[in-house]
């Protein structure tokens, strides 16, 4: 099993290219289920979750071909409607094949999902929304069995929470439903807009992205398209924290300020400067990090996927900070590992109090989920001495070439195999 060895204390300078968004690329691949024609996606990140989604689509009878560097061609007839446990258990996003299978094949059998061990992440909203569109759903032996023998029918769906996954599943299902569908309290994340733009390029009729209410006029069929996956705003924010925690100066090539409003505002409150340039975002820090209070919220609020990275940075900031997690349960699993490195973090329910310390110390630590993995890398970059990070397969799910990108900017980091 691979691990990272990090020797901290080096200031990062240089350029890092931001790849395609994991949280968009996965959903755009699933959109390929909605047509027999070819959906050609470019700027697809080379990460483990993309490979898992590829395996899932192939298992459903869809052909997925390499069509160039970071480019996939997806399409074909659906040969199976079962998404099995051995694949779905690896990745939470697998649940998103449910809506497209129902819309196009009128039936689906999808294992209840796995993925990161972050709270319960219930799928109730997905299922209730699909039932509103006319699906019949039964939960049996760990599987979701869904049918819509007469096809899905447009209706009004009000989500009790602006769930990203439920919005995406219902949005894709509604593109082939009969009539008009309203999704009220829809998620507003940039990745939702990316999915809307891709679906519209395939012939869907969707309006309202970013407004909180999506309006979908169903069509009989979708066609193929060429589409580029948006840059990964979470990867961009993560490397911005790397510049912040090391007092560095990084140009994040391809980074877009429009996707990172709350993150940029919070970085600036801590004393990290973010400048828009022609090729991306320049992030640098010359002064002292300052403590701030953060509350995670649905977009356009502060993203839960950036919480762990900011905690690492705030652990060496002046003063006290508080992070309140409102999206997921159990998303402070990185706290004991940070504390092993000398951080002073106490968890009280959904809030974590961080009292900044002058320095962290290298230690053996273990990753617990995707974003927590990178928070420990950040801590290792700032720590005195050597940090060994194990279970980095979590990291490989969502970040491409971490050691290569960081080393090119001056980090002392190496991947080793046991």
Curated annotation (Swiss-Prot):
UniProt pathway: Cell wall biogenesis; peptidoglycan biosynthesis
This protein's GO CC annotations: cytoplasm
Pfam families per the UniProt record, alphabetical: EPSP_synthase
Top-level taxon of the source organism: Bacteria
Residues with the 2-(S-cysteinyl)pyruvic acid O-phosphothioketal modification: 116
Record key words, sorted: Cell cycle, Cell division, Cell shape, Cell wall biogenesis/degradation, Cytoplasm, Peptidoglycan synthesis, Pyruvate, Transferase
Residue positions binding phosphoenolpyruvate: 22-23
Residues holding UDP-N-acetyl-alpha-D-glucosamine: 92, 305, 327
CDD domains registered for this protein in UniProt: UdpNAET
BP term (GO), one: UDP-N-acetylgalactosamine biosynthetic process
Enzyme Commission code(s) on record: 2.5.1.7
Residues annotated as the enzyme's active site: 116 (proton donor)
InterPro entries xrefs: Enolpyruvate_Tfrase_dom, Enolpyruvate_Tfrase_sf, MurA_subfamily, RNA3'P_cycl/enolpyr_Trfase_a/b, UDP_GlcNAc_COvinyl_MurA
Record's subcellular location: Cytoplasm
Catalytic activity: phosphoenolpyruvate + UDP-N-acetyl-alpha-D-glucosamine = UDP-N-acetyl-3-O-(1-carboxyvinyl)-alpha-D-glucosamine + phosphate
Annotated GO MF terms: UDP-N-acetylglucosamine 1-carboxyvinyltransferase activity
Cytoplasm keyword on record: yes
Main function: Cell wall formation. Adds enolpyruvyl to UDP-N-acetylglucosamine.
Family statement drawn from the similarity comment of this UniProt entry: Belongs to the EPSP synthase family. MurA subfamily.
The protein, known as: UDP-N-acetylglucosamine 1-carboxyvinyltransferase
